[in-house]
């Protein structure tokens, strides 16, 4: 069964559609902005390059040329999950920037996948039997030793990282974690009407 690299981006889109006022909805514009990124990436990444070179170039484009980034002082705000803000301001949080990278990777047929790491979303690139991990905060590669330190920081000294912590994410678990993060962000900012709308949207989806 083919892995759905675009699942997290689809959930980001659902979040936008569920909390946005109808008169403010501009889904065609969002599709246009994302489509433009895909076209630019295809133009900048030669088809004849190998996957390692393509992935490196994609990260350079996204975090370098296009200036997508996380702001250490503001990354936790709900706006960093809101597609128009992310695409216009080029700012997000690891899960939203990671969702965009995954969407672009799928469009370019590049083997980048999400990892449901305990501290935040991590990406893994699988090329020629090798795995490299990418921090969507910065687009930089992160070693297993660095991930082990993050794991110990979250769970205490001596905590042992498990293979499943570095594996491709289970999609339902990944989506559930995103939804909880989105709800928490809205409630923390006391955007209660938006949180209610989002919860109603999720409940309606369950009924379907």
Where are the regions a protein language model picked out?
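A structural boundary/capping signal
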Residues: 1-208
């Amino acid at each position: 069964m083919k892995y759905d690299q675009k699942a997290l981006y689809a959930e980001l889109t659902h979040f936008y559609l569920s909390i946005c006022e109808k008169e403010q909805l501009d889904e065609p514009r969002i599709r246009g902005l994302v489509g433009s990124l895909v076209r630019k990436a295809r133009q900048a990444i030669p088809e004849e390059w190998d996957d390692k070179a393509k992935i490196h170039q994609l990260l350079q484009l996204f975090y370098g040329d296009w200036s997508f980034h996380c702001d250490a002082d503001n990354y936790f705000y709900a706006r960093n999950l809101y597609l128009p803000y992310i695409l216009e301001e080029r700012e997000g949080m690891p899960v939203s920037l990671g969702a965009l990278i995954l969407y672009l990777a799928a469009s370019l047929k590049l083997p980048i996948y999400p990892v449901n790491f305990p501290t935040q979303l991590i990406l893994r690139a699988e090329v020629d039997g090798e795995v490299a991990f990418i921090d969507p905060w910065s687009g930089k590669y992160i070693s297993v030793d660095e991930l082990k330190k993050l794991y110990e920081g979250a769970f205490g000294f001596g905590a042992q990282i498990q293979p499943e912590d570095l594996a491709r994410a289970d999609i339902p678990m990944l989506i559930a974690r995103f939804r909880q993060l989105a709800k928490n962000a809205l409630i923390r900012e006391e955007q209660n009407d938006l949180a209610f709308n989002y919860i109603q949207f999720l409940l309606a989806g369950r009924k379907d």
